[in-house]
């Protein structure tokens, strides 16, 4: 994970707030490389070990409902780059056309298998592919949709100096987000 030169950052990231965080990160280049190497090999090993479980989940999803096994959506990662996030599909096909972007509580679009997969957070397993590709990390900020990233303050844009993460401090502290919101 090599840090770009500040001058090479996207124009919307060149501000004093981002520069402050950039200055800290540029002194941690070796740590960033180690983090990327760890992410790659850990994701690869986990993908190999967990592939039988992932195959079973894929079969369960396919048997329960029509549609693809994977849910793919465009998200934003390091330097504002777009990528397609992979997750196991836990909702009915075309659920994003049938309701809100945010899923809360007992959303009727969630399938029975999907509900169980979500409770165990197994829907995130395909993101190991995103980690291997370098689009995500194990720990990082939430991979957001472009609509929300466009609303970022200058300081929030500093989160785009690093790849999005499968997990983050916020996702650990607010594990039951829908319970907090409701």
What residue ranges belong to the model's regions?
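Hydrophobic structural segments characteristic of membrane proteins
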Residues: 1-20, 130-182
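A hydrophobic, helix-centered structural microdomain
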Residues: 3-6, 14-17, 22-95
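Acidic, Ser/Thr-rich low-complexity segments on the non-lumenal side of membrane proteins
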Residues: 84-115
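Short, conserved beta-strand/loop elements in beta-sheet-dominated catalytic cores
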Residues: 115-134
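Juxtamembrane loop-helix boundary motifs flanking transmembrane segments in multi-pass membrane proteins
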Residues: 18-33, 105-109, 124, 140, ...
């Amino acid at each position: 994970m090599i840090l770009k030169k500040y001058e090479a950052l996207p124009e919307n990231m060149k501000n004093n707030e981002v520069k402050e965080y950039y200055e800290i990160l540029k002194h941690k280049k070796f740590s960033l490389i180690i983090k990327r190497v760890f992410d790659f090999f850990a994701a690869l090993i986990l993908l190999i070990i967990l592939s039988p479980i992932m195959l079973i989940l894929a079969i369960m999803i396919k048997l329960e409902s029509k549609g693809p096994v994977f849910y793919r959506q465009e998200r934003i990662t390091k330097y504002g780059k777009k990528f397609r996030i992979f997750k196991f599909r836990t909702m009915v096909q075309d659920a994003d056309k049938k309701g809100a972007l945010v899923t809360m509580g007992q959303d009727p679009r969630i399938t029975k298998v999907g509900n169980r997969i979500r409770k165990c957070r197994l829907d995130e397993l395909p993101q190991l592919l995103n980690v291997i590709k370098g689009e995500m990390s194990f720990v990082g900020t939430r991979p957001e949709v472009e609509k929300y990233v466009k609303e970022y303050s200058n300081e929030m844009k500093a989160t785009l100096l690093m790849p999005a993460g499968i997990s983050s401090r916020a996702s650990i502290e607010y594990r039951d987000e829908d319970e907090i919101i409701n």
